[in-house]
């Protein structure tokens, strides 16, 4: 048993000390390796989220050290001594101590809530000039200090694919439903969302049928997509690359295959992709008329 434990310790140590290039990983693609959930500067928001992540860990470790220290101290200092048969002093309650047990955790949660909501609001708030009529951010507020949007993209989640309306460029992309194509998880057939690097994008999120969630793991942010509700968020991609996206809300049989890719490219490449959609006749916008409730109503009428 001792040799087995030693072998396990050696294996873990070797894995921890292995060069980073033995574990190739691209943020959002494959398995990310390391303590940090993404990389700083990937978007204009990831640095703040990573700081929140690190700060939460530091605070949790500080509390843990304090609790563990006091626990160990009590175990050692007040342990039962040899030939000590006396019953310790019994206390039914200790009001100051119980108040401390209540107030301190509430204060800790309040501090965590303050910093979490501050970082989250930075994603969700958009400028009045770019927020579409009838939409709300998840906070229900508008931040006058938010960046002016360079690009507006409307996204529809549907069982089980995605529609992307590039409103600024007046073109659209409609993903094929996995249930119709039978090509589950085939990389070449996944919908691809193109974003220009270093340009602020305002996303408007809607559902065509059931509850979905729009999630780009490398961006460290997820937004629910709910029927009858429109949510928005704003982000500026700052590093070119290909990142995975997925639905993060259980939405039926092919939920696990409701994937997409995000390609952050230079402006020239982005314009070329928009031109390809335009040349394919995919101009305009795919609106609510393709939502399930409207399609079902039309079928009933016929």
Where are the predicted features?
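Transmembrane alpha-helix boundary/anchor motif
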Residues: 12, 70-73, 115
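Alpha-helical transmembrane segments
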Residues: 55-78
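N-terminal secretory/membrane targeting signals
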Residues: 1-22
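Non-transmembrane, membrane-proximal soluble domains of secreted or membrane proteins
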Residues: 18-55, 78-302
């Amino acid at each position: 048993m001792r040799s087995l434990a030693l072998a396990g310790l050696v294996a873990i140590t070797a894995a921890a000390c292995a060069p980073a290039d033995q574990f190739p990983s691209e943020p959002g693609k494959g398995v990310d390796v390391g303590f940090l959930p993404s990389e700083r500067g990937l978007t204009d928001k990831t640095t703040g989220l990573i700081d929140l992540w690190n700060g939460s860990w530091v605070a949790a470790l500080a509390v843990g050290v304090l609790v563990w220290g006091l626990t160990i101290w009590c175990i050692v200092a007040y342990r039962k001594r040899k030939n000590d048969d006396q019953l310790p002093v019994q206390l039914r309650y200790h009001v100051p101590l119980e108040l401390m047990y209540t107030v301190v955790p509430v204060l800790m949660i309040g501090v965590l809530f303050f910093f979490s909501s501050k970082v989250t609001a930075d994603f969700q708030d958009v400028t009045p000039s770019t927020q579409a009529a009838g939409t709300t951010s998840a906070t229900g507020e508008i931040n006058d200090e938010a960046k002016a949007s360079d690009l507006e993209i409307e996204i529809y989640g549907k069982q089980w694919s995605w529609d992307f309306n590039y409103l600024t460029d007046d073109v659209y992309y409609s993903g094929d439903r996995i249930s119709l194509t039978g090509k589950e998880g085939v990389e070449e057939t996944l919908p691809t969302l193109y974003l220009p690097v270093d340009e602020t994008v305002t996303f408007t999120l809607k559902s065509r049928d059931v509850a979905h969630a729009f999630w780009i793991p490398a961006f460290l942010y997820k937004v629910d997509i709910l029927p009858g509700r429109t949510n928005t968020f704003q982000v500026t991609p700052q590093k070119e690359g290909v990142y995975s996206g997925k639905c993060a809300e259980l939405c039926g049989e092919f939920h696990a295959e409701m994937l997409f890719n995000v390609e952050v490219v230079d402006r020239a490449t982005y314009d070329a992709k928009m031109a390809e959609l335009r040349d394919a006749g995919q101009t305009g916008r795919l609106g609510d008329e393709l939502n399930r409730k409207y399609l079902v109503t039309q079928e009933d009428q016929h």
